[in-house]
């Protein structure tokens, strides 16, 4: 039987560590950590994600400064909002919920966030720190994957890792983190020819392609470890419900095809998703400790 990498359980364990770090630092800090999440427009998925992050903040004692901004906000207005949060002493982390409406310059807005308050690890300076192996905020989903692997004692060093997907949000930082852990890393993407021949060479396969059911039994080797970053809601037809064991959510991987073949896998839901939010909290608490002159007791949680 394969090992199921339970992100929900691990996220709860890490949240307890973060909560204890906050409570032990309050006497010196005189305030709780603060996280500002900016949501632009009425995208339903973004609304769900922001709500989930607010609940996570409540669980561990982080102040939430959520802002729901109008769909047609100008680049200048949103930049000014970010700048005001950069200067707000009670805010330790800022997250710009993606995707943004098409008229906004995502790269310019991410650059406008103070790198020291970059809760999502996407500022160019923090990506540069990742490349150089320096400490700093880390991209949340790849950081969650690394924690999931390490806490389950899955060896990375010396392994052949294949990352399917090359987004700045997941694929590229994921490859960098695996390389820093001494894996030999290959990145595959939509233009990769003969994807199965490449993925079957992997000891560790991380799939972040954003395509439902992209990976099946013909893509994986015996006893590999599969991390499924994707999450999708499928039409509720009978075939999908049967395959998904009566849930309407699926990932990029056909788990029902590979679960008897692999050594370990992350489920969808309950795998990478909870860890992504927990790493957002870890980035915020780490920044809070730094801003308040506290010992950096939780930085080991970030790769």
From Swiss-Prot:
Q: Which reaction does it catalyse?
A: (6R)-5,10-methylene-5,6,7,8-tetrahydrofolate + NADP(+) = (6R)-5,10-methenyltetrahydrofolate + NADPH; (6R)-5,10-methenyltetrahydrofolate + H2O = (6R)-10-formyltetrahydrofolate + H(+)
Q: Does the keyword Amino-acid biosynthesis apply?
A: yes
Q: Does the keyword Amino-acid biosynthesis apply?
A: yes
**Per its record, what are the GO molecular function terms?**
methenyltetrahydrofolate cyclohydrolase activity; methylenetetrahydrofolate dehydrogenase (NADP+) activity
Please state the Enzyme Commission number of this protein: 1.5.1.5, 3.5.4.9
Residue positions binding NADP(+): 165-167, 190, 231
Q: Which family does it belong to?
A: Belongs to the tetrahydrofolate dehydrogenase/cyclohydrolase family.
> Quaternary structure per UniProt?
Homodimer.
Protein name, per record: Bifunctional protein FolD
The source organism is Prochlorococcus marinus (strain NATL1A)
């Amino acid at each position: 039987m394969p090992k199921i990498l339970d992100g929900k359980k691990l996220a709860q364990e890490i949240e307890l560590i973060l909560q204890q770090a906050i409570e032990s630092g309050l006497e010196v800090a005189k305030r709780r950590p603060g996280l500002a999440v900016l949501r632009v427009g009425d995208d339903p998925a973004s609304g769900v994600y922001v709500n989930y992050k607010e609940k996570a903040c409540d669980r561990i004692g982080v102040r939430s400064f959520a802002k729901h901004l109008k769909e047609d906000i100008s680049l200048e207005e949103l930049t000014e909002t970010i700048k005001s949060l950069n200067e707000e002493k009670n805010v330790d982390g800022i997250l710009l919920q993606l995707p943004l409406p098409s008229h906004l310059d995502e790269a310019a807005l991410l650059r406008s966030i103070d790198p020291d308050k970059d809760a999502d690890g996407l500022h160019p300076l923090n990506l540069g720190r990742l490349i150089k192996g320096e400490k700093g905020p880390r991209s949340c989903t790849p950081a969650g994957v690394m924690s999931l692997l390490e806490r389950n004692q899955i060896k990375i060093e010396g392994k052949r890792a294949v990352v399917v997907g090359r987004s700045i949000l997941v694929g590229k930082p994921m490859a960098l983190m695996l390389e820093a852990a001494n894996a030999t890393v290959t990145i595959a993407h939509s233009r990769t020819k003969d994807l199965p021949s490449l993925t079957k060479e992997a000891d560790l396969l991380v799939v972040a392609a954003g395509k439902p059911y992209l990976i099946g039994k013909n893509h994986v080797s015996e006893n590999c470890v599969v991390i499924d970053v994707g999450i999708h809601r499928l039409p509720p037809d009978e075939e999908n419900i049967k395959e998904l064991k009566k849930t309407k959510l699926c990932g990029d991987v056909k788990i029902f095809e590979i679960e008897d073949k692999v050594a370990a896998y992350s489920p969808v839901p309950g795998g990478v998703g909870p860890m992504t939010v927990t790493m957002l909290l870890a980035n915020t608490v780490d920044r809070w400790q730094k801003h308040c002159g506290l010992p950096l007791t939780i930085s080991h949680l970030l790769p």
